[in-house]
C-alpha cells in the first residue's frame, strides 16, 4: 500500500504518495489545481494535477474518465504524456505529467518571438495536431496557455479535458473565445478537426503580431471582428447555420470583402502569410489539414515526412455516449488506473526531444 502525505496548497489539501515532494503551485483550472513537484524516484521535476471531487457527479466522473483515457492513449513528442496516476484515500484523482517551464501565453506576453521560433513552434503544434487528429480526436480548446514549452523549445499540447470524438453533434461553447472557430459559433452542431486548425491559425497570427488576432468582447463582437478581416462568410457556409436566430444575425451584418492578410501583417514573411491564409478560411471543408500544412514551404526548414507520425490506432470513443452512474464510472476509472500501472515500462518511453533551432 502506497504511503500518502498531505500538504496544503492555496487552501486545498494535496494528498500524494511519498514518491513526490516539494509541491509548488503553478496553475489553477476550472477542474483542478496543478503543482510542480520533485519525483523522488526519477529525480525529475513533474506536474501534479489534482482533479477536485471527480466522483461528485456523473458529468464530472465522465469528464475525468475521458481525460484519463486520452492521456493514456495519446503518446507523441508534441503531446503531454502521463507519467503516473493515483487515487488518494480521500478519493481525489491525481494526474502526474512531465513539467515544462512555461507556456506560449506567457512567452507571447513577455517578448516578441523571432522568426525561427515562430516557425519551430508552429511546426510542433501542427505535428502534434496531425497525430491527435489521426487518432480520431479533436482538441477543441487549443490556445496559447494550453501549449507548453521548455527551455529547449520543445513544445507539447496539453489539457485534453474538453477533447471529443470527431463526428457527432458537438454542442456548446468550448474554447476560449479568441481562438474559437466560426463554425462553433455559427452551428453549435457538427464540427471536426478543422476547428483546431483555425485555433492554430489564430495562435500563429498572434505569434506574428504579438497580440490576439480576434479579441472579441463577446461572441457577437467576435464574429463581427472576424468578418472585418476575412469578409462575409460564403453563402454555402451561411446555409449550414442551424439556429434561426444566428442565421438572422449573420444575414443582418453588412456585406464585407476579405482583406489581404499581407496588409495587416506588413512585416511578416510572405510564406507565413500564405500558410495563414489557408488556415483562416471560413469554410472548414476548404481549411488546410495539418498534414498539408506541415508540407507548406514556410515550414520547409523543419518538415520531415518520415518523422511526423500518426496514431497507431483510433481512440476508442465507445464510452462517450454512455449515461452511467458515478459508481460505474468509478469502477471503470479504477480499472484504467490498474491497467496503466500494469503497462510495460517500454511502452511508456518517449522518443528523444526535438532540438531547438
Swiss-Prot record:
One of its GO terms (cellular component) is cytoplasm. SUPFAM superfamilies: Protein kinase-like (PK-like). Gene3D superfamilies: Phosphorylase Kinase, domain 1 (3.30.200.20), Transferase(Phosphotransferase) domain 1 (1.10.510.10). It is found in: Cytoplasm; Nucleus. Dually phosphorylated on Thr-171 and Tyr-173, which activates the enzyme. Its EC number is 2.7.11.24. The modification Phosphothreonine is found at residue 171. Its cofactor is Mg(2+). It comes from the Eukaryota. GO terms for molecular function: ATP binding; MAP kinase activity; protein serine kinase activity. SMART domains: S_TKc. InterPro entries: Kinase-like_dom_sf, MAP_kinase, MAP_kinase_CS, MAPK_p38-like, MAPK_Sty1/Hog1, Prot_kinase_dom, Protein_kinase_ATP_BS, Ser/Thr_kinase_AS. Signal peptide: none annotated. Keywords: Activator, ATP-binding, Cytoplasm, Kinase, Nucleotide-binding, Nucleus, Phosphoprotein, Serine/threonine-protein kinase, Transcription, Transcription regulation, Transferase. The modification Phosphotyrosine is found at residue 173. A motif (TXY) lies at residues 171-173. ATP binds at residues 26-34, 49. Proline-directed serine/threonine-protein kinase involved in a signal transduction pathway that is activated by changes in the osmolarity of the extracellular environment. Controls osmotic regulation of transcription of target genes. Belongs to the protein kinase superfamily. Ser/Thr protein kinase family. MAP kinase subfamily. HOG1 sub-subfamily. The TXY motif contains the threonine and tyrosine residues whose phosphorylation activates the MAP kinases. This is Mitogen-activated protein kinase HOG1. It comes from Blumeria graminis. The gene is HOG1.
Amino acid at each position: 500500500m502506497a504511503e500518502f502525505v498531505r500538504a496544503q496548497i492555496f487552501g486545498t489539501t494535496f494528498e500524494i504518495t511519498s514518491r513526490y515532494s516539494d509541491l509548488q503551485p503553478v496553475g489553477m483550472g476550472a477542474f483542478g489545481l496543478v503543482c510542480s513537484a520533485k519525483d523522488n524516484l526519477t529525480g525529475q521535476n513533474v506536474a501534479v494535477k489534482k482533479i477536485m471531487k471527480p466522483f461528485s457527479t456523473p458529468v464530472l466522473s465522465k469528464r475525468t474518465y475521458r481525460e484519463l483515457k486520452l492521456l493514456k492513449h495519446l503518446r507523441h513528442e508534441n503531446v503531454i504524456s502521463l507519467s503516473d496516476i493515483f487515487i488518494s484515500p480521500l478519493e481525489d484523482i491525481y494526474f502526474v505529467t512531465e513539467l515544462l517551464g512555461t507556456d506560449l501565453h506567457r512567452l507571447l506576453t513577455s517578448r516578441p518571438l523571432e522568426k525561427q521560433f515562430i516557425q519551430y513552434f508552429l511546426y510542433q503544434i501542427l505535428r502534434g495536431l496531425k497525430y491527435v487528429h489521426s487518432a480520431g480526436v479533436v482538441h477543441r480548446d487549443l490556445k496559447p496557455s494550453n501549449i507548453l514549452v521548455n527551455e529547449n523549445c520543445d513544445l507539447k499540447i496539453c489539457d485534453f479535458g474538453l477533447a471529443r470524438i470527431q463526428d457527432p453533434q458537438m454542442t456548446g461553447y468550448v474554447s476560449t473565445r479568441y481562438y474559437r472557430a466560426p463554425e462553433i459559433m455559427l452551428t453549435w452542431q457538427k464540427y471536426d478537426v478543422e476547428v483546431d486548425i483555425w485555433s492554430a491559425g489564430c495562435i500563429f497570427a498572434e505569434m506574428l503580431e504579438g497580440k490576439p488576432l480576434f479579441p472579441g468582447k463577446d461572441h457577437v463582437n467576435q464574429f463581427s471582428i472576424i468578418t472585418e478581416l476575412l469578409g462575409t462568410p460564403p453563402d454555402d457556409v451561411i446555409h449550414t447555420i442551424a439556429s434561426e436566430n444566428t442565421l438572422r444575425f449573420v444575414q443582418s451584418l453588412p456585406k464585407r470583402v476579405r482583406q489581404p492578410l499581407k496588409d495587416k501583417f506588413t512585416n511578416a514573411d510572405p510564406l507565413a502569410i500564405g500558410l495563414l491564409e489557408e488556415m483562416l478560411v471560413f469554410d472548414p471543408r476548404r481549411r488546410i489539414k495539418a498534414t498539408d500544412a506541415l508540407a507548406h514551404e514556410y515550414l520547409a526548414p523543419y518538415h520531415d515526412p518520415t518523422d511526423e507520425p500518426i496514431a497507431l490506432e483510433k481512440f476508442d470513443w465507445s464510452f462517450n455516449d454512455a449515461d452511467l452512474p458515478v459508481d460505474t464510472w468509478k469502477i471503470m476509472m479504477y480499472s484504467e488506473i490498474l491497467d496503466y500501472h500494469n503497462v510495460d515500462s517500454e511502452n511508456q518511453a518517449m522518443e528523444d526531444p526535438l532540438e531547438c533551432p
